[in-house]
Every structure is written in structure tokens, then in C-alpha cells.
């Protein structure tokens, strides 16, 4: 049923064209250190007005620059490893298979290279592991470093792709693996590699770059270059990488097969690159190794991708499936609208008013007032409480802020003025803020904006934005009782969503005066820097 055998290419490995200069432009340790555009030592030698003791955990974190595209700061524990100028790009690399974050990647200006740019891979000590004399974007998968050229069409089969646009290196051995000619993207799938390739075949190139997928092919090969699968007029995505879920099965790939003219998708399937099983009708990956498929007769199936041997259908619904946690599924009623929560063990069905997905949690608010948060990996109920619907309820907003915490806004109007705002948590917290008191406190400067920031010690904290003197925006941090914890901040928000290695509980991103960084609930800096620090370029010219 809906399964196709993996195409075995009965020919020798596809001829690979690797330019001789590739290996020369890339080298693994030992390496001279990259030119530190903004040496971390300068910041370390400067007087500190912060205490980073709570960060001493050996984990990599990134502080994005204040109001600039570049200029980020990389820390390992309480140690600053790199502070970039505004012209340097830097980011953490999380291995999408292991979930570990042990490296960071930087790209900066270097007039000594042909491209005028250089990039490098660095470990948790700040040591350079790899140096490249060209600009690349990087991803890490099962210890393989996948490099792609950062052009505007890097993930598309445009006509100007060339050898070297995609490179794959094994960090354990330093070996560069074979890559097909004209590859434009690559994802790891189990022990194999899947490539998107520019392959025009007999098609006449369209110089306007329209209908690009008539020139695209998917090729899967062993690490030695032996080709095991080929699909012309197709594109490939990694289930694990595209969902940002380290627990997702890593050997399944989404294959989108296009019409011959590249105008439409004829079929979307999931392919197991290890076993060769291919299942058509793919709709969406949900969680805990389970995905949604549409059958040939139009029903929607929950399919376990991790079952032994081959995938297994768990159950079917007439309506589309929007969310899943072990033991429950949420469907959307096509005919009447609205959601339903299905207990897969008892068969009970609960009408749902709203749902919200967090990083690994599912929150639902039922029409009878039941509010629950499920762990999407285990199915455990983290929060189970009741918030009575208000009289004349028109709509709701449900915000899942992870860890079992959820924030519910109810409206008795159609003009987006919040009527009630309730915070619920895993420790039994169920508190409705006194919005009238908050409005009275801030007067005309308050525009009704409250946003979740952080949780600590069984309490949840939100930010209130309002206009202060000179019409400048200011932010107060309040608890779930509406009490002001910190006042007059220049900014106040949670650490970046889905970021590896979160900050300690009760630590958030803030600006106060000219200082910007990570602050605790006492208003003490855990780490901070001047907001103008990241506004300089490589030559230390500053832009304000």
C-alpha cells in the first residue's frame, strides 16, 4: 500500500567532477588561527559589570548583536570566545542528528582571497578547526560538515551551479566525500547522502530561471559515491532538518516529484534512504517519529516511521491531522471548522477551541474550558487545568511557551482588545492578570502588549511595553500576579526560540541604557556589552 521500492541504479557511480583546487582551499587542523576581527581578549581585559558564574556549564551560546545583521558574540560557558564586527556573520552549529552544539561557524572579509571572503569552523575552545578561502553556509549532520555557497539561489537548481558549490567533509577523519557535479544542496540521511542536482537533461535552459524544478534531480549515494537512487524532476528535504527536531528520524527524506515542465508537484512522498521504503501521500511530520499521510481514498493516517522493518499505520481519520503527542491527536474538521482532540487509547473526543505547538509540547484549550499541555515526545500531561470561557467569547489566542507553561488570551470583541489574560503552568499555576490595574498603572502609554519572557521558581514572567518620556518605548518585567519585577528596560524578551543550549531559568535578553545582554530577575547582568560594540566594521569604523 502506497509503497514503492527504492530505485536501484544499475550502473557505476555517477562520474564526479571535483576541481583540483577544492582540497587546496580547505584544510583541517593544524591551522593558523583566523584573523580575529574583534579579539575576545579586549573584552576580557575590560572592566566587567556582569557576573557570568551561572553560565559555567561548558555550553556554547550566542548573543545576537543589538540592531545589526552581524556583530554577534559567541560564548562557551562564562568565557567569551569571539566578538564579531558588523561585517562578520557567525552562528552556532547544532548537529541535526545528535542534537549536540559543539562548534560555531564564522564568515568574514579577507581581501587576500579570490572571493574577498573567508570562513572558518571553530570548536568550544575557540580553536579554528577548518579554514576556507571562499564564502560558505554550513550545516552539521552526524559529524559531517555540509557546505553550500551562500548565493541567492543556493537551494535552487539555477543554471550557474558548478563543482565546489556543495562540499561534504567528515570532521572525524578530515576526508572530503565525493559530491555529484552541479549539486546545489545536500542532506545526510542515515549513513547515506542525498543531493539536489542541477540536471537539465534534454530540457532547453530557461534563462529567466522560471520553472526551475524541471532542471532538478534527487540523487542518493553512499559515502564512497556509489549511487543508489535517482529521481529526475524532484527536490529533497530532510525530515529532521526541516522540522528542527533532533528526535525526528534521520533516515527519512521528503521527496517532491515535479511535472516534466517543473510547474507543479505531482507527488510528495517520504523515502527511507536506508531501507528503500517509499510512502506517498505525505502531508506533514508531527512528532515522536509519527507523520501524517493522506491515503488514496482521502482519509488521513497517523504513520509511525520508527516501527521495525517498515512504517506502520497507527490509525485513520476523516479529517486532516494538525498535531500529535503519544496517546492523542488533534484533527481539524473540514466541514464545520474547529479542532477535535482524540484520545487514541479510549476513543474519547473533545471539542477544541484553540491549539498551540511549542518546541516539544502541544497545548490545547477545549470549548468546555479544559486547558492541557502534552509532552510531544512522551505524551505526558504537563499541565491540566480549567480556564472558564468568558461571557460573549469571540476568539482566543493560545501561546505555548514550553516547559508546560501556556498563556491564554480571550476576547469578547472583534477589534483585538484583550479581555482576559491567563497564565497556566505545570505546578498548578492558573492566574488571570488584572488588565484594568495594568492599564491604570501605565495610562495612555500602554497599548495592551504583553509578551512571555521566562519562567523560574514556579513563576512566569511577562514584559509590558509602553511609551515613556519622549515617546520612547520602555519595557517592564511583571510576574503572573501583575507585580512589577523590573522597570524601565530598553528591551525585554525571552532567549531565542528553538535555540540550542538555553539560558539558565530566570535569565532573559534585555537592554538597559547602553548595555545589552543577558539579565536575571534581580536586574543583574549575567553577561552584557555596550550596544555600540557590534556596530564597527573590520577596520573599526563605527556606524550609528
What is each residue range found by the language model?
Residues 2-13:
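Bacterial N-terminal signal peptides that target proteins for export
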Residues 22-42:
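Sec-dependent signal peptide cleavage junction
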Residues 35, 39-544:
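Residue-level detector of conserved, function-critical positions
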Residues 14, 18-22:
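Hydrophobic core
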